Amino acid sequence: MVMNRAAAKLLGFWAMIVVASVAYACKGNEQIRNGSATKAGSGDTLSSTTVNEDGVGQIQVGMTLDDAVSQGLLNRNPSMNSECDYAYPAVGSGLPDDLGFMIVKGKIVRVDVDTGAVTTDDGAKIGDSEDRLRTIYGDELQESPHKYNPGWHYMTVMGDSASQGKAIVFETDGKKVTRYRAGQLPQVQWVEGCG
């Protein structure tokens, strides 16, 4: 089938209408699921996921796991270790599955990012070069050798959040960011997570 430009434009227009309708319907379901139109429409949407030292979207460092679960943001692991363990995004929360939230004594203390789909507020992400981090963060970036892998690095951003006891820690393979985490000190620096 050969399609002229006018037909292609018309097809593209209808495709956009369908996508917009689905997106609108999904947002409506989010409002229903959360039980509050203001919560879903507050402008703090989880679909535009960015991370900073304070958390991601509605999930903030210092928030209790109970609050995050009751708001439909995180799942509770029934066999969770009360001292330190991880919780993960609830289905329908709008958060990528590749985020992990460290819970220490019932409170969220850090978010671990293992997906390139999530950036920091400054635009840094997995796959970025060490030079890009240096460009973004400048003098705020502190470099140190990786605990287990020679040639790899931790690149830590304290910046203004240092007075609040929070940081972002990027792990690199000596060239590119392989993962990062953000949250409260000292937990954000724990290399083994809860291990």
Which stretches of residues belong to each language-model region?
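Bacterial signal peptide processing site
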Residues: 27-29
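Short, low-complexity, Pro/Ser/Thr/Gly-rich segments in the mature regions of secreted, periplasmic
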Residues: 183-195
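A cross-family detector of function-defining hotspots
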Residues: 33-35, 63-104, 125, 130-176, ...
